[in-house]
Structure formats: structure tokens, C-alpha cells
Amino acid sequence: MPIVSKYNNEQFDALMNDLITALEKHKAPVDLSLMVLGNLTTNIINGMAPAQRQAITEKYIQALTASVDHRHDAH
């Protein structure tokens, strides 16, 4: 999501591929995948210090919104 990251591409790609593989293994449809990833996101944020939660949530929402392709023909 971010353009500049403190994580290297290999670390990011490995984790993302593991998550995609798990969703594919369970043949999770889009709605179930989003529910699981949403709950995972919530658990990660709730594990942070309470004072940080609101700010990180807002940054996450902004990054997610910016990364979604809003064209009607996008796939």
C-alpha cells in the first residue's frame, strides 16, 4: 500500500503470497476473504497501544482508499 516502506520487497512479497495461498487453499470467496482480513486487521490494531489506534486506523483507511482502483472497467 505505501509507496515508501521500511520493509524490503522480498519480506512483503513473501508474507502477501502466504496470505493469498491460505485464502486460495480454503477456496475463500471474496466476502469471506474480506471478513477474515478485516478481523485480522482489527486484531492487529487492537494489539497496539490505545493512544495509537485511532491514528493508525485513519492512515490505514486513507491508504486502502487510495490503493483501490475506482474505474468501472478495472479488474
Swiss-Prot record:
InterPro entries given in the database record: UPF0352 (IPR009857), YejL_sf (IPR023202)
Family: Belongs to the UPF0352 family.
Name of protein: UPF0352 protein AHA_1665
Membrane-spanning segments: none
Protein's organism: Aeromonas hydrophila subsp. hydrophila (strain ATCC 7966 / DSM 30187 / BCRC 13018 / CCUG 14551 / JCM 1027 / KCTC 2358 / NCIMB 9240 / NCTC 8049)
